[in-house]
Amino acid sequence: MSAAFPPSLMMMQRPLGSSTAFSIDSLIGSPPQPSPGHFVYTGYPMFMPYRPVVLPPPPPPPPALPQAALQPALPPAHPHHQIPSLPTGFCSSLAQGMALTSTLMATLPGGFSASPQHQEAAAARKFAPQPLPGGGNFDKAEALQADAEDGKAFLAKEGSLLAFSAAEAVQASLVGAVRGQGKDESKVEDDPKGKEESFSLESDVDYSSDDNLPGQTAHKEEDPGHALEETPQSGGAAGSTTSTGKNRRRRTAFTSEQLLELEKEFHCKKYLSLTERSQIAHALKLSEVQVKIWFQNRRAKWKRVKAGNANSKTGEPSRNPKIVVPIPVHVSRFAIRSQHQQLEQARP
C-alpha cells in the first residue's frame, strides 16, 4: 500500500534540506509566548478573509474511498485497522498544524518564507499518531496539509502585493491631481498677462495704426502754410469709410488754440518725453495718445518738407526736383563749361 504513494513521500522529503537553520525540537518543546507588544503583524488582517476558503484541504474522500473498500480484504490480525480511526487522526494533526501556524504567524513577521512552513509540516508529522502498517493515508494527509499551507502563504503574499499596488495607485493618482492643479493655476496666472498684452497691442494698433497716419498727413499737406486753418475741415471727415468697408477711427478735431500750442511745442522740440507729453495733454485737455499721434504726423510732414520742398526757394516747382547727376570722368571740360553757362542763363 505504501508503494502506491511515492510522489507524496518524495514531496514531503524534499523541503527538509532548506529548514536546517532552525531546530524543530526547540520550536516544539517550548512554543514562544507572544508578548502583547509583538503582536503587530501587518499582513494578518489581510490574511483573515482567506482562512475559511484555503484552510480546509482538498476533499480527502477520493483517496480514502478505495482504502475503505480495501479494508475488509486485509487480514483480521490487525483489529485497529478500523475506518473511524482515520478521520480522528487526520483532524488531530490538522488542529495541531493550525495552532502552530497561528503562533508562528504571531511571532514571525517574515512568516512568508519557506522554512517555517516546512517546519510546521514536520512538527505536524511529529505530533500525529503513529502511522499504521498500511500508513499511506497519513502520508497523503500530510502532503495535502503542506499543499494547503503553501496555498495560504501564496495567497497572503498575493494580498500584500495587491495592497501595495493599490497604495501605489492611490499615491500616483494624488500626485497626478496635484500636478494637474498646479498646471491649472499656472494657466490661470498666465491668462491675465496674455489678455493684458493683447489688449495693449490692440490699443496701440487702434490709435497708431498706419490707416490713421496717411489721412491726417494728407489733410495737412493740402495747406502746408496754414496749419491753424485746418480745424473747420477736420470735423467733416468724421466717420468716413474706406473702399474695403473698414470703419476708420474718427479724426480728432483740434481747436485753433490747441493747434497753436502744439505748433509752438513742435517748433521748440521735435521729440517729446513722456512727462512733457503728459503735461501738454493735461494743459490742452487732450489725451496723451492724441498728442503723440499729432507729433508723429507733424514730424513726418516736417521731414517731407525738409527733403523735397526745399527746392521751392529757387522758384522751381516742387514736383520737379532737381536731380544732381555725377559727371563721368571722360566728359570733356567744354561740355561741363557749356552746362554751367546754361545754368547761369536760366537763373534770373
Curated annotation (Swiss-Prot):
Mitochondrion among the record's keywords?
no
Gene Ontology CC, one term: nucleoplasm
Tissue specificity is: Expressed in adult brain, spleen and female genital tract. No expression in heart, liver, lung, kidney, or testis.
What the entry lists under PROSITE patterns is as follows: HOMEOBOX_1 (PS00027), HOMEOBOX_2 (PS50071)
Query: What's the main place this protein lives?
Result: nucleus
Query: Is Membrane among this UniProt entry's keywords?
Result: no
Its biological purpose is as follows: May act as a transcription factor for cell pluripotency and differentiation in the embryo.
Indicate what this protein is called per its UniProt record.
Homeobox protein GBX-2
Gene of origin? Gbx2
